[in-house]
């Protein structure tokens, strides 16, 4: 007989039962215990907080840095008739106030919040009156300074706990070393240690490192010899475009994705890839978080990530359906040189950081003692041209200044426009002095979007252009005019990065960069760089075991995955024997039924692996259910 958790799972998600440690985590947080769940990518983290929250009174607050994931999960919850909202950088004060009031007086079950919003006075004032069931911390490794993706804003969560002392916390992450596991619990003020961990082993995912000086040719070769959806990760935005163009010329359908693209373009490309209209997504690390696509057969890293944590998380997007998939790292000596150079690029000297802070004030014309709370649009190219800086070093300096508490730097703001009608539908029909063009825009909005009279709705201005037969500038000015007349509330899209001062501006020489922000993190970053280099160069230990060991799982030789490049190479003597026997069977050049291979008494997985390689090397070809060797 199903219990209440299983009933909710079946009713809202249609799954018959829980997987792995999902139930353990659910029951732990439902008992009011602070809980840390370690689950690999695709392990079903969201179920562990969404299910128990529906059995409790009050709002489940979900802290996550991933705006795209927030929007996606809120959309999915609303589609299941579960009330959910999200607050993140870029919303107007009016929008935030409406959401918080609904949490106090309405029936909202989930409130997704970006960590930056936790410190705002408005949020903290309203939070005191919100009935909270429990707090979920997604990407919990971000709170640890030992982690590869530390975010200072996550430290605000501990202060929120002080405001809600009886409310338990559920922390979730897909990547955490033993040190990070310990630190997460300390930083979140766990009453006692309480960790549930799934093995990070992915038995269907073959980790491969290919050493090559011609990565592009190798990449094309791999994709030509395999089938199915693929992701290729590259470090630079320019490189993603170039590689997508190269693949298309080779007859492999591909597109590219990075944080600098218009949000509408990103949405379209992501949707086309998810619907298999495009086979290959070439992307920076801006792509992948919260992407719900289980049948990715190939993940290729053409550039080395900065850490094994980042590599493991990105590689883990392959084979989430449990079917065979590959994670391939293309590597050569220049990668090691580039990675070691990244250390100084990521941690420029402190005097340079102070100079950047001083020049920001000149650039924005902010006097000493002023600026707190002010936000400025920031064009990094213009800033670098003005002061003769390299953008990479400036970007690093700004992130260190942010971690040191001087500024908030948002280099990838949400780019979609939003509107809400301020008058009722009946009053709208009674409006006078509405021009023909204004009427066409209003009609376009009403026909293509729902909920405009009750909530802020994201709109696609290019769609309104098409249906109203106006250009973008005309649509924009009409929306601005309707907003000025209080018919609608129009929030234009904002694509330009911005910087906010989080404290009054100081003289540059007074800026203090804390040891834990520079010295400690540089040491950690260096260790992360060395770990990925070591992984790429170690061709004697099973790839899966190397990764599991890094994340604190004890393994033995019997735990070798059997499918990574290291394990396959260890089987070479047997592999050569299998190849010889297959070729001997096919030596007459005639078509043979594929079932004839069953007479060769070898392990089925070993046979499958050898056959894949033989096809890739054109040693035989397949015609229906026949195989032919052309001597």
Model regions and ranges:
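C-terminal accessory/connector segments of nucleic-acid motor ATPases
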Residues: 349-504, 510-610, 617-630
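Amphipathic alpha-helical interaction elements
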Residues: 14, 224, 599-602, 612
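Helicase motor core with emphasis on the C-terminal RecA-like subdomain
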Residues: 1-12, 16-20, 24-46, 52-61, ...
């Amino acid at each position: 007989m199903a219990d209440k958790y299983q009933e909710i799972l079946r009713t809202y998600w249609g799954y018959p039962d829980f997987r792995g440690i999902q139930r353990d985590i659910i029951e732990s947080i439902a008992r009011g215990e602070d809980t840390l769940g370690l689950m690999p990518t695709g392990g079903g983290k969201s179920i562990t907080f969404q299910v128990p929250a529906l059995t409790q009174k009050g709002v489940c607050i979900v802290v996550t840095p991933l705006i795209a994931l927030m929007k996606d999960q809120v959309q999915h919850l609303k589609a299941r008739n579960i009330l959910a909202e999200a607050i993140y950088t870029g919303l107007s004060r009016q929008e935030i106030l409406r959401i918080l009031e609904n949490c106090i007086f309405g029936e909202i079950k989930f409130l997704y919040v970006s960590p930056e919003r936790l410190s705002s006075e408005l949020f903290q004032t309203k939070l005191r009156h919100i009935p909270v069931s429990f707090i979920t911390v997604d990407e919990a490794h971000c709170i640890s300074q030992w982690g590869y993706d530390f975010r200072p804003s996550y430290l605000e969560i501990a202060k929120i706990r002080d405001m809600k002392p009886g409310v338990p916390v559920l922390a979730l992450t897909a990547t955490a070393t033993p040190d990070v596991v310990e630190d997460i619990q300390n930083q979140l003020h766990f009453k006692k240690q309480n960790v549930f961990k799934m093995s990070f082993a992915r038995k269907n995912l073959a980790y491969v490192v290919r050493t090559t000086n011609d990565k592009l040719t190798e990449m094309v070769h791999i994709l030509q010899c395999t089938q199915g959806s693929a992701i290729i990760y590259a470090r630079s935005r320019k490189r993603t475009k170039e590689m997508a163009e190269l693949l298309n010329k080779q007859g492999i359908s591909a597109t590219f994705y990075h944080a600098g693209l218009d949000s509408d373009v990103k949405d379209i490309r992501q949707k086309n890839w998810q619907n298999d209209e495009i086979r290959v997504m070439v992307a920076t690390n801006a792509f992948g978080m919260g992407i719900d696509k289980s049948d990715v057969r190939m993940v290729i890293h053409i550039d080395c990530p900065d850490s094994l944590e980042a590599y493991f998380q990105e590689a883990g997007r392959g084979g989430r359906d449990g079917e065979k998939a590959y994670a391939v790292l293309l590597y050569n000596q220049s990668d090691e040189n580039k990675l070691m150079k990244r250390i100084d690029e990521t941690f420029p000297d402190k005097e340079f950081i102070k100079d950047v802070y001083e020049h920001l004030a000149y650039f924005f014309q902010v006097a000493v003692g002023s600026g707190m709370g002010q936000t400025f649009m920031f064009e990094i190219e213009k800033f670098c041209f003005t002061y003769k800086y390299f953008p990479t070093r400036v970007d690093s300096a700004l992130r260190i200044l942010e971690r040191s508490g001087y500024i908030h730097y948002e280099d990838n703001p949400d780019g979609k426009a939003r509107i809400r009608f301020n008058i009722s539908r009946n009053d709208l029909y009674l409006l006078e002095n509405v021009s023909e063009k204004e009427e066409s825009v209003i009609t376009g909005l009403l026909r293509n979007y729902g909920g405009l009279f009750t909530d802020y709705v994201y709109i696609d201005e290019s769609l309104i252009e098409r249906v109203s037969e106006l250009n973008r500038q005309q649509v924009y000015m009409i929306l601005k005019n309707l907003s000025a007349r209080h018919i609608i509330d129009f929030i234009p899209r904002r694509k330009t990065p911005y910087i906010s001062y989080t404290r009054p501006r100081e003289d540059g020489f007074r800026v203090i960069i804390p040891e834990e922000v520079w010295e400690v993190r540089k040491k950690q970053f260096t260790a992360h760089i060395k770990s990925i280099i070591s992984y790429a160069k170690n061709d004697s230990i099973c790839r899966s075991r190397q990764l599991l060991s890094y994340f604190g799982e004890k393994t033995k030789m019997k735990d070798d995955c059997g499918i990574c490049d290291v394990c396959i190479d260890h089987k070479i003597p047997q592999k050569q024997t299998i190849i010889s026997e297959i070729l001997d069977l096919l030596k007459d050049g005639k078509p043979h039924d594929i079932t004839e291979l069953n007479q060769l008494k070898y392990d089925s997985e070993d046979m499958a692996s050898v056959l894949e390689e033989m096809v890739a090397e054109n040693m035989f070809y397949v015609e229906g259910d026949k195989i032919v060797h052309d001597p």
